[in-house]
């Protein structure tokens, strides 16, 4: 057989650092034949000999091999140096620089809103809501100032929530009416990735219009599209006035929808959802969210539809077994599911053990990343399992859903005696099983 060169991928942990302050790097060598001689690491030009794990080779279905290595190193040891992975076979040498992958930084949009003067008078307190929208990464710090001085009470900041890969949060300040109408200036400060944004509001100001409502439409999840007969579209209307009406249409045909969240004393947002058939969504039909109110000259409309996919590529799925030395020496083991070569980027990964769903808290999926050709994507999932469960012969399956897969779902199953993973197309009966485990 003709020798095949190794294709190298650089990987890094989902979090910027582990709990002990260390960083985890991964080197994945794929599609090579015959076997490689070694995988080594270097910091600049100096060899690294500690903190390494070398995993066994896996023979792929097409006769080539996959092998990986993991490096654990502290942030101070890395410093400003470059980390390289080197793969050698005879006189052939392949080198990959492992780049930092903290992800794109998306600064938040910060919006400050207040309760009406009528509400303040009747309730005897004012509510100010600081909305922090669409930021990445997750870590933020929210603080409040009163006439430029830090406040240590009177406000509550909600936990962040994730929507489509970015994060949002709110912080609510409650002020007695007497203080609010005393010409005091309140400031919401949001610190994110070394940048601080400030928004001010003055208590004596008479509330007035703060602009038209803003509409944001959210598509259904890929898991819902692949596994369910109906899917849910979501319309988020921020800056919504009291008494706003939100409705849905398909072209000009009205649809039955539900209001999930109404505007109240601590929010100016309305969330409306509508359930449609999966077939209608896949057809590319246009769906409209319509916002109307007596203060709007004409209703506001926003539309959403499934984008046409011109480059459909089926994913290649492989599972990397734990190293033999870990099986006998560690209390917990890791299984890695690599999914690559797919397009479009929408995909989901789950794990099952003995055909039962694994708690999502036991595994982590990376962000979807572009491959070298920028036309296909890859993602990997790391499952943590107890060594005694692995030793008992339990079967673990990486379940992958993508629209390019003929039956929409495939899995790869391994156990301690399987030697090498088996590739399985899930039957329609198993689809029902997976769906029932949502």
Curated annotation (Swiss-Prot):
Glycosylation sites: 166, 200, 245, 275, 374, 411, 415, 425
Xref: SUPFAM superfamilies: Immunoglobulin
Domain Ig-like: 5-101, 108-202, 213-305, 315-415
Residues spanning the signal sequence: none
Name of a matching Pfam family: C1-set
Annotated protein name in UniProt: Ig heavy chain C region
Keywords: Glycoprotein, Immunoglobulin domain, Repeat
